Amino acid sequence: HEYKRQMMNVLHILAEYNRILEDNVYAENYYPKTYIFGAKAAPGYKRAKLIIKLINSVGDMINNDPRVKDKIKVVFLENYSVSIAEKLIIAADISEQISTAGKEASGTGNMKFMLNGALTIGTLDGANVEMLEQVGEDNIYIFGLKADEVAARVKYAGTDEVKNIYSSNASLRHALEQLVDGSIVPGSNQMFRDLYQTLLFGDYGFPD
């Protein structure tokens, strides 16, 4: 589902990758990270499948770049299941629970990560709400808009405010342009154009 915002996660990874290549001081002090994704998409959910394709393509680009081989990696676990989760949860250092506030049902996966020692960063959504109440704000890292704030900002989709953010944030702009400049999948600048268009011009997160 788009509301889980793994698209945002991928853009963040691209921004980190770009900065490692462009900023020697940042690269020298960068703490190595492996980003692990596990997901499925309904057969007819084209945009969700395209996001999975993007995750894998970004992973191929980064994992095969010798300049960052000891700094950043991207892994996608196919057919994510309980059996895979049993191995992943106990090994994770950070649990990213970043769904759009007001969209996620209250599951237990994030609780399992926390109980096994992973630090949780995320939005005030789903079971994060109950976890915050139980562990306190010093033990969970909450960021982003609350559900009512998200609802109030939907009207800005595709407006000049989106374009202003795009224009003023060079790191974000670079990552977005990589979706359509052929750098992720050499020779193809159209594969992820739908994601680029919907983020900038208005219907990201709505049914495709």
Model-inferred region functions:
Residues 1-85:
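Long, K/E/R/D-enriched contiguous segments that form extended
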Residues 29-33, 69-71, 84, 89-93, ...:
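Short, well-ordered loop/turn elements at secondary-structure boundaries
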Residues 36-39, 93, 146-147:
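C-terminal, helix-dominated tail/subdomain
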Residues 70-74, 94, 103-105:
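Extended, charge-rich low-complexity interaction segments
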Residues 90-91, 98-208:
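Catalytic binding pocket for nucleotide-activated donors in carbohydrate/polymer assembly enzymes
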